[in-house]
């Protein structure tokens, strides 16, 4: 009798898992169901472009039916409850499983900063990107009617909290988009203040070479971006934010990209978790329940060298492959596979014409040449997930 495998989450890790498992096992061996209430996969690494209107919604949403193997059944329903003891998943219906794979991703982490959750715009999901888009456009429309200079400046100050990959990529888009919005709305671009606030000694801490990071900072400065490091946010209100130094920065727009934690969905699961709520897994991607696996951002794994699995697409995909292999072994026999991360590096956008690359085979550099390389990486992913058709769609939506 075929074993039942239920996957919750249709992001990078969830889709990679079902694609890999369906290649390893036939429908006689396994019945695979993927639960994703939206019915689409969001190309989340590109949502900063959508937030600032460089690409359309269609460019970052991939219908799951287009990329899932025919042997995988898509359930476009919200999972409301999981009964680990009886191995059941509940939507409006109930489903039995032999193996459960949790791939629900992560949520923003506000680190208990007073007022942050209530007053900042988080930047993590597609819905967040849409809210940011609506908010910034509304600011530029409303400011035309404001005469008070202090109020105008507060409205035209845009702060990104967090100088990691996500925050810098968003600022890269904001600095170009606010140019356009200023012209459209008759606003003096020089009156627009852009700021990155980072608690650590420098932005982009995962980029090895400080001189390369400094080049990116210099590029952003050409657009008037003020990069503040060693600047921890201690309080946020509707009218601004306070730094640990005591400085108050008046603003109506704080966009928070300062960290993530385990998805709140997992709170119901009686599984071992780390201090950020992520599900602890071993090298086989197994949780404290032998029939439950966790992959991607929701998984917390520390290897024998005390290295933490980072929240990157590459690590999500590799964790999915390991889980698929080990569930296959549980069903058919064989040797388990331990996770041995092979990360090739990172490339991030700093606007449309500039990027920062940290690639093992090529080194670390900044400049225009990082952009075509980033497109190549994205197209490689599109081909891997959905074949040549998705590559052509990517070229149409984002290159030509």
Task: Give names to the regions the model predicted.
Residues 10, 93, 104-105, 245, ...:
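Glycine-rich, N-terminal phosphate-binding loop of Rossmann-like dinucleotide-binding domains
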Residues 72-81, 175-281:
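A Rossmann-like FAD-binding core segment of flavoenzymes
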Residues 146-151, 307-309, 328-360:
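Active-site-proximal substrate-binding core of FAD-dependent oxidoreductases
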């Amino acid at each position: 009798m075929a074993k039942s495998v239920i996957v919750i989450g249709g992001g990078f890790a969830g889709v990679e898992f079902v694609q890999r498992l369906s290649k390893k096992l036939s429908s006689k061996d396994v019945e695979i169901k993927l639960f994703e209430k939206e019915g689409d996969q969001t190309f989340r690494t590109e949502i900063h472009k959508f937030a600032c209107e460089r690409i359309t919604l269609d460019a970052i949403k991939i219908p799951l039916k287009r990329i899932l193997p025919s042997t995988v059944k898509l359930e476009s329903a919200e999972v409301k409850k999981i009964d680990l003891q009886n191995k059941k998943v509940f939507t409006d219906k109930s489903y039995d499983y032999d193996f459960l794979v949790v791939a629900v991703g992560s949520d923003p982490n506000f680190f208990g900063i007073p007022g942050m959750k209530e007053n900042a715009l988080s930047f993590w999901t597609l819905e967040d990107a849409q809210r940011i888009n609506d908010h910034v456009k509304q600011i530029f429309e409303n400011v035309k009617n404001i005469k008070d200079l202090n109020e105008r400046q507060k409205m035209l100050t845009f702060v990104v909290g967090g100088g990691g990959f996500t925050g810098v990529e968003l600022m890269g888009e904001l600095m170009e988009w606010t140019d356009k919005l200023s012209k459209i709305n008759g606003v003096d671009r020089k009156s627009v203040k852009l700021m990155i606030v980072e608690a650590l000694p420098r932005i982009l801490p995962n980029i090895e070479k400080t001189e390369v990071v400094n080049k990116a900072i210099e590029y952003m400065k050409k657009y008037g971006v003020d990069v503040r490091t060693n600047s921890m946010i201690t309080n946020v209100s509707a009218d601004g934010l306070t730094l640990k130094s005591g400085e108050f920065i008046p603003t109506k727009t704080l966009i928070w990209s300062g960290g993530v934690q385990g998805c709140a969905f997992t709170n119901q699961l009686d599984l071992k978790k780390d201090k950020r709520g992520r599900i602890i897994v071993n090298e086989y991607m197994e949780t404290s329940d032998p029939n439950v696996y966790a992959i991607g951002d929701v998984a917390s794994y520390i290897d024998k060298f005390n290295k933490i699995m980072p929240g990157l697409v590459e690590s999500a995909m590799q964790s999915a492959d390991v889980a698929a292999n080990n569930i296959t072994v549980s069903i058919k026999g064989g040797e388990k596979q331990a996770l041995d991360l092979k990360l090739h590096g990172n490339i991030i956008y700093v606007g449309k014409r500039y990027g920062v690359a940290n690639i093992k085979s090529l080194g670390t550099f900044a400049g225009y040449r990082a952009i075509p390389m980033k497109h190549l990486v994205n197209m490689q992913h599109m081909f891997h997930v959905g074949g040549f058709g998705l590559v052509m769609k990517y070229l149409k939506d984002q290159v030509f």
